[in-house]
Amino acid sequence: MHRFLSKKKIQHHIYVLNQVDHFRFNRAALINAGFLESSNSTDYIAMHDVDLLPLNEELDYGFPEAGPFHVASPELHPLYHYKTYVGGILLLSKQHYQLCNGMSNRFWGWGREDDEFYRRIKGAGLQLFRPSGITTGYKTFRHLHDPAWRKRDQKRIAAQKQEQFKIDREGGLSTVKYSVDSRTTLSVGGAPCTVLNIMLDCDKAATPWCTFG
């Protein structure tokens, strides 16, 4: 990514958000925490899955001034093709992310947080933009995800099956609870990088599916 962004002359700082607590994976809460911990010198964020790498240099990673820019659009993502999909790689100005109150913290386990975030984007009155003129189709990205790695995070437990389709109108960036266990700043192949080991907090009365078993 560093070579890719540097070639496009995009200044960047990579934040690796590593969940080190004993709860199930919560991508949205990690992104909320990463947003709060990121430097004030940044103008926008890239919510970028680590298992999705761009292969087409024509992809735009520039400042999404007009509104959220979904780099990994349904027409290009190798796996997810439904029209409301906004996962994988999404660029937002910090102002727009705050306008949405970030992402819902209720999604423990894999998936569905992006679908809820799509509704937040629309509810905030923002227009979603996607790439145009990209001719590489489903070969635009390299996708390294293997669901067998984290089987416990694929499960839908108890009321989670119903909750996953609801809109969280109260929680988000303003309510995420976490602590930073450690912070390491380093350079990887010349890329400026900060690794945050994050311990999330779970209200088990509200979301008992944060644990498994």
PLM features: residue spans?
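Conserved donor-nucleotide/metal-binding helix-loop-beta segment in metal-dependent transferases, i.e.
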Residues: 55-79
